[in-house]
């Protein structure tokens, strides 16, 4: 809600948010605006994950390594038709992109844009590293997962999640996609 006025000044014709506010343009109040953003981004890109085989990988440790190993195997098996999105970059087939993040899952609009680009490039499989923060914050909403893999779950990120149960629940969101 911190940027609503700036969005209106830049030409926004409608706003989606979580709190009751009075605006002169249409306002849709939702329980989880971040999750809605994921589905809106997916719709904007014509739901690219529906046309790809998406392998989601999460865990406390080993996500990035497992993502890259799985990508290598799939890329060989599909003759170059596999890509990946991880915390350190994305592979679009013929092109590698530094996501600039190196710590967590990209935003929902970025993920959907990457998936759409991969689909347009003729890829058929994508390995997607999924952090607990990204899952909890709805950044992966709108991504259809075909295969879900968990490397491990140990006591980490409790500063963000508050408890081990909440951390485990965030990881479990992957199985609802």
Give the location of each predicted region.
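Phosphate-binding loop of NTP-binding sites
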Residues: 36-177
